Curated annotation (Swiss-Prot):
Family membership noted in the UniProt record: Belongs to the TRAFAC class translation factor GTPase superfamily. Classic translation factor GTPase family. LepA subfamily.
Molecular function in Gene Ontology: GTP binding; GTPase activity; guanosine tetraphosphate binding; ribosome binding; translation elongation factor activity
Enzyme class, spelled out: hydrolase
One Gene Ontology biological process: positive regulation of translation
EC number: 3.6.5.n1
InterPro entries xrefs: EF-4, EFG_III/V, EFG_V-like, EFTu-like_2, G_TR_CS, LepA_C_sf, LepA_CTD, LepA_IV
Residues annotated as binding GTP: 20-25, 137-140
Gene3D superfamilies, A to Z: 3.30.70.240, Elongation factor 4, C-terminal domain, Elongation Factor G (Translational Gtpase), domain 3, P-loop containing nucleotide triphosphate hydrolases, Translation factors
Source superkingdom: Bacteria
Compartments (UniProt record): Cell inner membrane
Catalytic reaction equation(s): GTP + H2O = GDP + phosphate + H(+)
Pfam families with a match to the protein in the record: EFG_C, GTP_EFTU, GTP_EFTU_D2, LepA_C
Protein name: Elongation factor 4
């Protein structure tokens, strides 16, 4: 069984890149070149284990691999690569992974240049005190401009890129130079073997056979199989059943020392019992203080998930419980809706997280789902001095008791080619944005806006992509709460409120949103035998109305000539019947109408 490795022979690093700049391909090449995985087991994006990660070309969970590399100086180094998610929703996972390593490879596409997510992740790496080695990928493309991109890295990020490593991850060009740069330009970890055990919990996932598998980075001390360890945030104590390193398959190891990254299993039942960023120490003679910077994951965006077929509710419950085993940041509770039946109110870290969870439920568990309009968490300050959190617009308290409402704001960084800048500024302005900064890097502009999260969760990203023909990149951080004039808009169909369509809107935009919603519903709801009013209302005040006219039979068809009062009598009789029908009639709203109304392009 392999033993511990000396500190000066370890290099821990992560790869920072924007989506599609070749991060996972580079990881594949490093693994391939060092023979870590046999050729026959090699597949593209080997560290992305979920189908959805491969398909969307994104990394959702942090993954790790230990590579043994015989360097040119004759010594064999242990390289631990943590493949981090690049997307903003998973920013906390990124920050923890960053704290677990000492250096980063900054991968930039030599034809595209620096993008918004590259920036966000580089700043996180710099915050974590990383040494950063710039790597320019795709230099074999005809459109590659390494010199322009080098100067862009220096201008935008302020890193010296003169000795950037030039590679093509696809063809394997320049990969040996990357390995040498990791060994010689990134620092070895620090740590004290004799000190009490202090290890950081970097990630955890659920395995059907082993229970919860926990990935750790040892800071000080030594951890061995059979030790009793304690999680400092939850206070739970476990006995270690198995210690291993990932190559990417598990290889058992007797002990892990300072600077090493590995995994352990300890009969832990749920991923919720392990908090990313927690500190692990020995039950007896443990370390005095936990590692700084821990914070529990807080859901930011909420939406309702309902099965299209009510009989699938139990299947949905099972699927959600299984997913939650593996995703501690995903929260759920049951909810009922008059329009959609039984379902769940779920909380997510952001829009991509919501899409990924929904896709996984539909794909892995074969469910048909309706997603209600995503909403954010509002803070409602009541007149009696109490504070309520509002996750679902239907739970909005009576406005007479409300003092004011605060909504979450974000700081959005958008990188966009110059010619689309005007459209992007207009889009942000329309979404109640406040411009904070505008700067240029070559032919690309970088705009920083303060925006309400409520305006972004709906369809901001899609609109941004369409006004910029797909060239803009977008990244955001949540900055805090601010008071604004927000109201709850209800939709009434035939004078009955439809809970699934109610939403929180800004007072100035309510009329526009209301009008668009009722016009859309008028197209979507089929005609009935009686006329149906569709209204958008704030409190008791109707702000927009459309009427779906009734289908009617020509009751006077059988009257030939003769007296007009005969026709009148038949028409009045029909009118009275329609009135009675409207009183007792139920309006059937088809599922498709809900789905389309919630996709509304505002």
């Amino acid at each position: 069984m392999p033993r511990m490795t000396q500190l000066d022979l370890i290099r821990n690093f992560s790869i920072v890149a924007h989506i599609d700049h070749g991060k996972s391909t580079l990881a594949d090449r490093l693994i391939q070149l060092t023979g870590t995985v046999a050729e026959r087991d090699m597949k593209a994006q080997i560290l992305d284990s979920m189908d959805i990660e491969r398909e969307r070309g994104i990394t959702i969970k942090a993954n790790t691999v230990r590579i043994d590399y015989p360097a040119k100086d004759g010594r064999t180094y242990v390289l631990n690569l943590i493949d981090t998610p690049g997307h903003v929703d998973f920013a906390y996972e990124v920050s923890r992974s960053m704290r677990a390593v000492e250096g980063s490879l900054l991968v930039v596409d030599a034809s595209q240049g620096v993008e918004a997510q590259t920036l966000a992740n580089v700043y996180q790496a710099l915050d974590a005190g990383h040494e950063i080695v710039p790597v320019l990928n795709k230099i074999d493309l005809p459109a590659a401009e390494p010199e322009r991109v080098k100067s862009q890295i220096e201008d935008v990020i302020g890193l010296d890129a003169s000795d950037a490593v030039l590679i093509s991850a696809k063809s394997g060009l320049g990969i040996p130079d990357v390995l040498e740069a990791i060994v010689h330009r990134l620092p070895p970890p620090k740590g004290d073997r004799e000190a009490p055990l202090k290890a950081m919990l970097v990630d955890s996932w659920y395995d059907a056979y082993l229970g919860v598998v926990v990935m750790i980075r040892v800071m000080d001390g030594v951890i061995r199989k059979g030790d009793r360890v304690k999680m400092m945030q939850t206070g739970a104590v476990y006995g270690i059943d198995r210690l291993a390193v990932l190559k990417p398959q598990m290889v058992d190891i007797a002990e892990l020392g300072p600077g090493e990254i590995g995994v352990l299993t300890a009969s832990i039942k749920q991923v919720r019992d392990t908090r990313v960023g927690d500190t692990i120490t020995h039950e007896k003679k443990g370390c005095a203080a936990p590692l700084p910077g821990f914070k529990p994951a807080q859901p930011v965006v909420f939406c309702g998930l309902f099965p299209v077929d009510a009989n699938d509710f139990e299947a949905l419950r099972e699927a959600i419980e299984k997913l939650a085993l593996n995703d501690a940041s995903f929260t759920y509770e049951m909810e009922t809706s008059a329009a959609l039946g039984f379902g769940f109110r779920c909380g997510f870290l952001g829009l991509l997280h919501l899409e990924v969870v929904r896709d996984r439920l539909e794909r892995e568990y074969d469910l048909d789902l309706i997603t209600t309009a995503p909403s954010v968490v509002y803070q409602i300050y009541m007149k009696d001095g109490t504070l309520q959190e509002l996750h679902n617009p239907t739970d909005m308290p009576d406005l007479t008791y409300v003092d004011h409402i605060e909504e979450p704001r974000i700081r959005a960084t958008i990188m966009v080619p110059d010619e689309y800048l005007g459209d992007v500024l207009k889009l942000c302005q329309d979404r109640r944005g406040i411009q904070l900064d505008l700067s240029y890097a070559g032919a690309r502009a970088m705009v920083v806006y303060d925006l309400p999260l409520n305006e972004v969760v709906f369809d901001f990203y899609d609109r941004l992509k369409s006004v910029t023909k797909g060239y803009a990149s977008f990244d955001y951080q949540i900055t805090g709460y601010r008071e604004d004039f927000l109201v709850k808009m209800s939709i009434l169909v035939n004078d009955e409120p439809v809970d699934a369509l109610s939403m929180m809107v800004h007072r100035d935009r309510a009329d526009m949103r209301g009008r668009a919603m009722v016009e859309k519903l008028k197209e979507l709801i089929p005609r009935h035998m009686f006329k149906i009013p569709i209204q958008a209302a704030i409190g008791g005040r109707v702000i927009a109305r459309e009427t779906i006219s009734a289908m009617r039979k020509d009751v006077t068809a059988k009257c030939y000539g003769g007296d007009a009062t005969r026709k009148r009598k038949l028409l009045d009789k029909q009118k009275a019947g329609k009135k009675k029908m409207r009183q007792f009639g139920k309006v059937e709203i088809p599922q498709q109408a809900f789905i389309n109304a919630l996709k509304m392009d505002s």
